[in-house]
From Swiss-Prot:
Organism: Streptococcus pneumoniae (strain ATCC BAA-255 / R6)
Designated name of the protein: Zinc metalloprotease ZmpB
UniProt cofactor note: Binds 1 zinc ion per subunit.
Motif range (LPXTG sorting signal): 73-77
Residues making up the signal peptide according to the UniProt record: 1-33
């Protein structure tokens, strides 16, 4: 029934057949070796069962048995299933697994010896055995684990003989049947091939005999063979003899047995039998009787031919090969067995093996003999009498017999399996069979019988595995056609056809595995990134078991959101997958999926996802402006070799100098130079490399090579030019020549002659060669400066990039073109300038421009409001026709015109429209204006008579007019709008304002109408083709604004952030920058503001080298800053770049310094700088007098810190990315050539820029980070420039030096701007005055508060005064004092300087105590100035506010120092002692002054008031009491002309000293020069009203001019009253000689004298003389006579002589207040000094300051005198004017006033007390005077009396002081009676 599933068991090469077969079915991986046995439950006795131990066996057990009990039947399968092919175990059977230390596989062999497996799902052999190997217990479905038997128990049970260590070989399974299953009726299951080998000695029984049993068996010899394992073919059966297994010791060898073909006798054999030899060891083990094959029934059909096979039946003694299929083989001889007969009723069942557990063994031997047949051979004898298909047996063959004797070992008389020896011998020889075969010809042919291919399932082979078990062999058949013959001849009858099989075909048998295959294993190997190529390659390893088919391996690339980006199929034979076009900084997921088939259908396995990200972080030079090829010779001299005409022979001397737009220079050593041809252009390819440096190629890929291309310079041919350098040089040398472009030219690396490439006035012709329109590319300056009579035509300017923000009048073609022609020119690019910036030319002067176009950008930064135009700023009588503009205009404060700003015809009315026109032109683009500036989309204006016609605008104007900019459009149309005709703007395109009336008359047209008009304008310039030079493409020259637009993940809204991050990360590539920029939040200032610089800080100080930092300061363009903490990153992963994480930003910071070892270079530079001394020749070549710089102390400091300074210098300067001795050599040469300049510059900056901002020192920032404000100059060049000239190093020019060489370089033009900016940026201060006081550590500033309300909110403080022209030189020295201690008194009019050292205040305690004295003096100075601010006329009052309106007058204390003596100019006192105030301040600023010991103080003034007017104290100390008086004196000289006299100057004929001492100087009693007690007024001192004062005691009480005038009236009238009383008392004495009391104030006509320009009558001086004899006798009866005769008292008056108001001899003379000056000595012109001062006070007292004092002392009436009095400004003219002709001379006026005073006095005055007596009446006073005069006259002749007028003078003083005191300083009424 299951015929096709029969198997036999055979011992083959020592392997039990069941093992071999099981291996085929299961094909396990042998991981351990084990032996498994079924054990019959009957063998496991009750005793043994009691010995079964529960739990798991001890792992130390070497041998043990596992006991299982079946709990269900195994599942059955299909017909092909092994389980259904053989008997099944009965339910309840036990499974005993013998286990040695290792287990290989589980093979369960059933009752009949067949292999029985659990169902496929029940036991996974590998997993199960591996588990058993580890844990000792196998869990198997269908079996229940019972327990285990130890090795000792197994021995007791007699089950240990099969378990010896050496008996089980790896892979071998020995099965013992111990169960007695029920007999089966299925004869197929009872065949002998289904018997199993028993490893224990089997009982020998005789097989039952049959009638057909042969009597004899021929013998055959058995030979050893090494045949391979037999193949089991489908449909065939193999019989196998039981293979003996030796259980104890040694290996078992097997010898082959001969295979004998078995055929039924009914079919004759036509072929000799084939022999099959099988190796066996020793003699075969005789089978038990129950193991012999039962007899097949006779009706069993014969096996088909293709299923017949050699069968071997297990024998005990004999086997008969010729036995028919239905016969049973009988043994010829019987052998005794221990149990010869089966028990009754149990036939067919396996006998039970008894176990004899004995421990002592007796061994012996037993010999057995068996006979076997030997086949005979057949001999064929040819017979030509018969046809070839006829044969006759001549003799029958007979078989031989072979006897085999085997000796076995016996144990306790029981035979064992063990074979000790085997011998064979032939008992009966073989008799060959003889057959005659016909050879008579017949027609025969042979044909091939194709073999068939059959498949057999094999569950030992992995599914999907196909294995050829038997090769197919084609058969042969013979086809015989037999013809009937007559006498040997054929007849025509059809032949008889017979087919004879000559060779049967052998089927091809293919075993098809059904066992589940191992899973293939796919693993990640690695992922290799190629960052520059934006790719990554994933590599795998694949382990694929045979038979498994890999359907696909796919790699899916997913983005961060899980979206599939791409999918790549991985080839099985190339396990690499490259993913290209990856994005940087994108987190990708790599998902790998493998689909495979193990014969069970497709299965899918996913690998663990891998994350991958390409982070490109390299060094990239960005924002490149220019790349130059530099050559350095052996001496270190640099030469620009960019304009190559041949390939350099030695690249070792070359380096690339890469300059960015912000002026940063990077140097790269050149590795190679190659001449190449690209697009027909010969170029030089220069290559450099540096660590981690990448360069962007033209195709936007990145390379690790830095390559720059230079054009090969071709020489001119005649006047045709092929290189720009040669062209501009020749045009400069020969500006009248004719020049032609023979090709496109490139201006890169060509140096301009100045502001333009050609500075000479060009008068020649420039064009392209005929029929060409060539282009000059890459202009960075205007082509021409100016031209006259020139012709420019037929060329273009391409890629223009002019960036000149400092320059006015900037245009690509040039500035001025006079009487020139410009035609057919196209300009494309960008132009930036200050004021007057255009796209073509600045001015056309009677010139013609036609068909010229500009396309690009224009940016005017200036604020002067100049004209600027899209093409032309000013067109003066010039014609601009058919021109075109399409661009973006940005203006700050300019008068822009979209095409032309000013179209100006001029005043010639006869050629209107012929000249001065703009016609047939187009303007497009945008115009963005900060200030309106009267800008227009088409023009600014067309005054006068400029003809503007047929023009079209599409300009979008923001903050300007849509067409016509100027308000003049609404002016007289005859000059303007009448000539503005047919000009249109395009509706819905052009935009802008129309704020003027006539603007609204300008019409719009549609785009279509505009296009139609434009088509007829003849404009073609805009269409001229411009091809980018190949070097532009190769060098990737792009517009700065477009630099980031092509970068991955670029966001337009983050463009500013990217620019800003370049400052934080100056080295990194653009992709990195964009990625970092996109990480910022929208609120970040890096997104919203422009960054100027980023500077590292440590502990609150700037770090200017590569030292570690803990914070960075980000400085924004709006003047703000942010500080962020940073933390160092140990490895930036970019060579030579130091990196920090920035707190709160999520980005990194890298200092703008290359991080590399510079020790050697630092040493060399330091050596060079150290060699410089201040008195060296190098320094003296810069300044003849190094000592005049006062830099000795700073120079010493610099030398002491040179190590650190040089380190900072080089780290900021040296951006050499690769090692290059050439560049280093050039650097050292530069240092050597400029070492004196460098060291002086460092010394200067160290001296003057150590400024403190709330503890933040500014010095190193100035030295090494001048890029802080946004510009990036070369540090070395910056220092060299500073140190190159003496004027840059002098302390008195610190302000100018900053402006000239520092400010413009760093981006802050003025020092004041720098200090104010820094103050706001770095400190909490908002006022520079407050900050300065705080920052100037060694300066005490006294700022007395003004009482003048109008001045309180004006600039009047210390910094206001210092930041004022000439005082600017003091700012930096004061901020940088180290040892000197200065104090400054700052008022709105003056600024006074002195030092604590001068007054011997050398300790902090002394200085602090002295500050109160400083404040006292400061208050006095302020009080004086405030007095004048109240007194001065409103029109000139603000002239006193010099701190705001001019320059405060400097006041310098003298240079005498307590304990040091007088200091010389160099700052050394007596004995050479250092005077630090001079060394640190007064010396360097040139404010030291030599002491003039002949004067107390002096003023230096100019003929006209000047900013450098100054006051110097000489002998007098500023801080002395008299110092205040001296201050009022000297400042009178400075201020009087501008403020004290209402703006009028000194009265003609007077000079300086006539106005100070004795007039406007505040008197002080500390001096003895007559000032105190003379006419005057106290404007400065605050005194007590104690009755001892001579002047107003508190100036601030007189808080208005009216009060001051009132005071002066009381002051003068009190003195006049006293004079009147004295005069009256003297007159009453009736003197016979008037000279006893009086003398004369006479006139002296002026003569030639110093400072006098008026000579002769009527120009007079005062002449004080004695009375003439006549005058002595002159009767005096009233005061009027004294007035009329100009008598003066002898007392109080100076000695006789001439008193001048000019010069320096007598003009100082004061007038004693108690002296009687009765007359006025009226002059007809100028006057003498005593009269001048006396009259001035009296005029002030009577007419007031404005109407009396000023007209008298100044030139106020000079104009009137010139008109009315022949130019004579005399007293007579003045009194007439002042009194309005009431008085004709001073004497009339004074007499009148005396009487007024007398009358008022008679009516009453303020009560006083004199010598204890109260006085309240005039009579009382008169009595006192008469007494005093009498006493004085009485002692006239007494020579012992020194003062003969003492009683009178003393009385006058007593009364005066009382009057002053009792009127509260004359601030209240002097006279008590009501005044009329």
């Amino acid at each position: 029934m299951f015929k096709k599933d029969r198997f036999s068991i055979r011992k083959i090469k020592g392997v039990v057949g069941s093992v071999f077969l099981g291996s085929l079915l299961m094909a396990p991986s042998v991981v351990d070796a084990a032996t498994y046995h079924y054990v019959n439950k009957e063998i496991i006795s009750q005793e043994a069962k009691d010995l079964i131990q529960t739990g798991k066996p001890d792992r130390n057990e070497v041998v043990y048995g596992l006991v299982y009990q079946k709990d269900q039947l195994p599942q059955t399968g299909t017909e092909a299933s092994v389980l259904t092919a053989f008997g099944l175990l009965t339910v309840g059977s036990l499974l005993l697994i013998y286990k040695r230390k290792k287990i290989a596989s589980v093979f369960l062999v059933g009752t009949m010896g067949l292999v029985v497996l659990p169902s496929a799902g029940a036991v996974d052999p590998v997993a199960t055995l591996a588990l058993a190997s580890r844990e000792g217990v196998v869990e198997m479905e269908g079996y229940r684990y019972v327990g285990y038997l130890s090795g000792d128990i197994l021995k007791t049970l007699g089950l240990d003989t099969v378990l010896e260590e050496t008996s089980a070989k790896p892979g071998e399974v020995t099965v013992v049947e111990v169960e007695t299953p029920q007999s089966t009726t299925n004869q197929e299951q009872a065949r002998t091939e289904n018997q199993v080998v028993e490893t224990e000695e089997a009982p020998k029984e005789e097989a039952p005999k049959t009638e057909e049993s042969p009597k004899e068996e021929p013998k055959s010899e058995v030979k050893p063979t090494d045949d391979t394992l037999p193949k089991v073919e489908e449909g065939k059966e193999d019989s196998a003899e039981p293979a003996p297994v030796e259980e104890v010791g040694g290996e078992v060898e097997s010898k082959p047995e001969e295979k004998v073909a078995v055929k039924p006798e009914s079919q004759p054999s036509d072929k000799p039998a084939e022999e099959s030899k099988v190796e066996q060891a020793g003699e075969p083990v005789a089978p038990r009787k129950d193991e012999q094959a039962p007899v097949e029934p006779e009706n069993q059909p014969e096996a088909p031919e293709e299923e017949k096979a050699v069968e071997e039946t297990p024998k005990q003694e004999e086997s008969t090969p010729d036995t028919k299929a239905e016969e049973t083989v009988e043994p010829k001889e019987e052998t005794k067995t221990a149990k010869g007969t089966q028990e009754e009723g149990k036939e067919g069942q396996a006998p039970v093996q008894e176990v004899n557990p004995e421990y002592k063994v007796t061994t012996g031997t037993v010999e057995k003999s068996t006979e076997s047949e030997l086949d005979f051979t057949t001999e064929v004898v040819p017979d030509d009498t018969k046809y070839v298909d006829e044969e006759v047996v001549e003799r029958q063959g007979s078989k031989g017999v072979q006897v085999t004797k085997t000796t076995y070992e016996t144990v306790e008389v029981v035979e064992t399996d063990k074979v000790l020896s085997t011998t064979t011998e032939v008992k009966t020889p073989v008799v060959p069979k003889v057959v005659k075969k016909g050879t008579k010809p017949v027609e025969t042919r042979e044909e091939v019988i194709p073999f068939a291919t059959k498949e057999q399932e094999d569950d030992t082979l992995k599914r999907g595995t196909r294995q050829v078990a038997q090769e197919g062999v084609n058969g042969k058949k013979q086809i015989t056609e037999t013809y009937k013959t007559i006498r040997g001849e054929k007849t025509n009858e059809a032949p008889t056809v017979e087919e004879t099989v000559l060779q049967a075909p052998q089927d091809e048998i293919i075993k098809k595995g059904t066992k589940g295959l191992e899973k293939p294993t796919l693993q990640w190997a690695n992922t290799e990134k190629d960052v520059l190529k934006k790719s990554a390659t994933a590599s795998y390893t694949l382990t694929k078991p045979a038979g498994v088919e890999i359907k696909s391996i796919k790699l899916a690339l997913k983005d961060k959101d899980g979206q599939l980006v791409k999918e790549v199929t991985v080839a099985e034979n190339n396990l690499n997958a490259t993913l290209d076009k990856l994005k940087y900084y994108q987190g990708y997921t790599l998902s790998t999926t493998m689909v495979y088939d193990r014969g069970e259908g497709e299965e899918t396995e996913k690998l663990e996802d891998k994350q991958i990200q390409l982070d490109l972080k390299k060094v990239e030079i960005k924002n490149i402006k220019e790349t130059s090829l530099m050559n350095v010779d052996a001496e270190g001299n640099e030469t620009d070799k960019s304009l190559l005409s041949e390939k350099p022979t030695d690249v070792s001397q070359l380096y690339l100098r890469v300059t960015t737009h912000d002026n940063k220079v990077t140097r790269l050593a050149v590795s190679s130079v190659e001449e190449v041809v690209v697009d027909g252009k010969t170029l030089y390819k220069v290559v450099a490399k540096a660590p981690d440096l990448v360069q962007r190629r033209a195709d936007d890929t990145l390379s690790e090579e830095y390559v720059h291309y230079f054009e090969k310079q071709l020489p001119k041919v005649n006047n045709v030019y092929y290189n720009f350098n040669e062209l501009v040089k020749d045009m400069q040398a020969n500006p009248m020549g004719e020049f032609k472009l023979g090709a496109d030219l490139n201006a890169v690396n060509v140096k301009p002659a100045g502001k333009a490439y050609v500075m000479a006035k060009f008068r020649g012709t420039l064009s392209s060669v005929e029929n060409h329109q060539y282009t000059i590319h890459n202009l960075e300056r205007p082509l021409f400066n100016e031209a006259e009579g020139a012709t420019l035509k037929n060329f273009n300017l391409g890629n223009v990039n002019i960036n000149m923000p400092w320059a006015d009048k900037v245009a690509p073609i040039g500035n001025m073109f006079k009487k020139s022609t410009l035609e057919n020119i196209k300009v494309v690019g960008s132009v930036t300038g200050n004021n007057d910036v255009t796209g073509a030319v600045n001015k056309l002067d009677e010139a013609n421009m036609r068909n010229v176009a500009f396309i690009g950008k224009i940016n005017s930064l200036g604020d002067k409001g100049w004209w600027s135009g899209g093409l032309v700023s000013e067109s003066w009588r010039s014609n601009t026709d058919s021109v075109y503009f399409d661009g973006d205009i940005v203006g700050n404060n300019s008068k822009f015109g979209g095409l032309v700003a000013k179209v100006n015809h001029g005043s010639n009315q006869w050629d209107v429209k012929q000249k001065g026109r703009l016609t047939n032109s187009v303007v497009k683009g945008t115009m963005t204006l900060k200030n309106h500036g009267q800008s227009g989309g088409l023009v600014h204006e067309n005054y006068d008579w400029g003809w503007v016609e047929n023009n079209i605008s599409m300009m979008k104007v923001n903050n300007g007019e849509i067409m016509y900019g100027s308000g003049s459009i609404d002016g007289d149309p005859y000059f303007g709008f009448d000539y503005f005709k047919n000009n249109y703007y395009v509706k819905d395109v052009a935009t802008g304002e129309s704020t003027y009336k006539r603007s609204k008359q300008i019409q719009s047209i549609s785009q279509a109408e505009a296009d139609a008009k434009i088509a007829n304008m003849g404009i073609t310039a805009n269409t001229f083709a411009i091809q980018d030079p190949v070097v532009n493409k190769l060098n990737r020259i792009i517009d700065r604004d477009s630099e980031y637009k092509a970068i991955q993940d670029y966001q337009e809204t983050r463009n500013l952030a990217y620019r800003n991050l370049e400052k934080l990360q100056p080295f990194y590539n653009k992709e990195w920058i964009v990625n970092q920029g996109n990480k910022l939040t929208d609120e970040s200032n890096l997104v919203k503001k422009t960054v100027l610089s980023v500077t590292g800080m440590k502990s609150g100080q700037f770090v200017t080298d590569l030292s570690s930092v803990d914070k960075i300061m980000i400085h924004y363009a709006d003047g703000t800053k942010e500080e962020f903490g940073v933390s160092a990153i140990s490895d930036s992963r970019v060579k030579q770049v130091k990196e920090y994480n920035v707190d709160d930003l999520g980005v990194v910071y890298t200092p703008n310094m290359v991080d590399k070892n510079r020790d050697s270079l630092i040493t060399k530079v330091k050596e060079k700088l150290s060699s410089v001394a201040l008195d060296s020749a190098e320094v003296k070549s810069i300044t003849n007098n190094p000592a005049s710089l006062y830099l000795e102390e700073s120079f010493a400091e610099v030398r002491e810190t040179l190590d650190k300074l040089v380190k900072s210098l080089l780290e900021n300067e040296d951006h050499q990315l690769n090692s290059d001795e050439v560049a280093e050599k050039a650097l050292l040469k530069k240092v050597e050539d400029n070492k004196a300049k460098i060291i002086l510059a460092l010394t200067y900056l160290n001296r003057y820029y150590g400024i403190d901002y709330d503890g933040l020192n500014f010095k190193h920032l100035m030295m090494f980070k001048p890029d802080f404000y946004g510009k990036t100059p070369s540090i070395l060049d910056f220092l060299i420039r500073i140190g190159s000239a003496e004027k840059n190093l002098k302390g008195d020019r610190s302000l100018e030096a900053y402006r000239e060489v520092i400010g413009g370089t760093i981006g802050k033009g003025e020092l004041n701007g720098l200090l104010g900016y820094n103050m706001r940026l770095f400190t909490k201060y908002t006022d520079l005055n407050d900050w300065f006081i705080h920052a100037a550590k060694n300066v005490y500033v006294s700022e007395p508060e003004t009482t003048t309300e109008d001045f309180k909110d004006k600039r009047h403080r210390i910094y206001d005064g210092l930041n004022n022209d000439v005082h600017g030189r003091m700012i930096l020295p004061l901020l940088n004092l180290k040892k000197a201690h200065i104090f400054v008194i700052s008022t709105y009019n003056t600024i006074a300087f002195s030092s604590f050292e001068k007054y011997g205040k050398n300790t902090e305690e002394e200085r602090n105590a002295y500050k109160a004295e400083i404040d006292r003096v400061a208050k006095a100075q302020q009080r004086y100035l405030d007095f004048w601010s109240r007194l001065a006329l409103p029109k000139v009052r603000n002239q006193l506010l010099k701190s705001q309106n001019s320059v405060p007058t400097p006041v310098w204390d003298n240079q005498v120092y307590v304990g040091l003596g007088g200091a010389n100019r160099m700052g050394y006192g007596d004995g050479g002692r250092v005077v630090t105030p001079v060394r640190e301040l007064f010396g360097p600023t040139d404010r030291w002054h030599q002491i003039n010991w002949n004067m107390g103080a002096m003023a230096k003034i100019y003929e006209r008031p000047w900013k450098d007017d100054q006051v110097y104290f000489m002998v007098t100390n500023m801080m002395e009491p008299f110092g205040i008086s001296a201050f009022t004196h000297e400042t009178t000289h400075v201020n009087d002309r501008m403020a004290y006299y209402g703006g009028d100057w000194h009265r003609e004929g007077t000079d300086l000293e006539a106005f100070a001492q004795g007039m406007l100087q505040t008197p002080d009693k500390s001096t003895t020069n007559g000032e105190y007690g003379a006419l005057g007024i106290n404007m400065a001192y605050e005194r007590k009203n104690d009755g001892e004062q001579l002047y107003n005691y508190d100036p601030e009480k007189l808080d208005s001019r009216e009060k001051i005038d009132s005071y002066m009236k009381n002051y003068n009238e009190s003195m006049m009253m006293l004079d009147y009383l004295e005069a009256s008392a003297v007159i009453r004495q009736n003197l016979s000689d008037n000279s006893k009391w009086f003398k004369k104030m006479d006139k002296e006509w002026r003569t030639n004298a110093d400072r006098n320009r008026l000579i002769g009558e009527p120009h007079q001086w005062d002449k004080l003389r004695d009375l003439t004899e006549e005058e002595k006798k002159l009767p005096i009866d009233s005061i009027d006579k004294l007035v009329e005769n100009n008598f003066v008292t002898l007392h109080g008056m100076p000695k006789n002589g001439r008193y001048r108001t000019e010069g320096f001899d007598s003009s100082y003379q004061p007038v004693n207040m108690m002296a009687g000056v009765f007359g006025g000595n009226t002059s007809k012109s100028t006057v003498g000094s005593i009269s001048f001062k006396h009259n001035a006070f009296r005029m002030w007292g009577y007419y007031g300051y404005e109407n009396g004092f000023i007209p008298y002392v100044s030139n106020k009436l000079k104009g009137a005198a010139n008109k009315e009095n022949k130019g004579l400004l005399g007293d007579d003219f003045i009194i007439k004017k002042v009194s309005k002709n009431q008085f004709q001379n001073l004497e009339e006026w004074k007499k009148h006033w005396y009487h007024e005073v007398y009358d008022k006095a008679q009516k009453g005055f303020v009560e006083i007390e004199v010598d204890g007596v109260k006085i309240s009446t005039y009579a009382q006073l008169q009595s006192l005077f008469e007494e005093a005069v009498s006493k004085d006259l009485a002692g006239m002749d007494d020579k012992n009396i020194k003062n003969h007028y003492q009683y009178t003078e003393n009385l006058k003083w007593k009364i005066y002081k009382q009057l002053l005191k009792n009127t509260d300083g004359f601030s209240s009424d002097l006279f008590t009676a009501p005044q009329a």
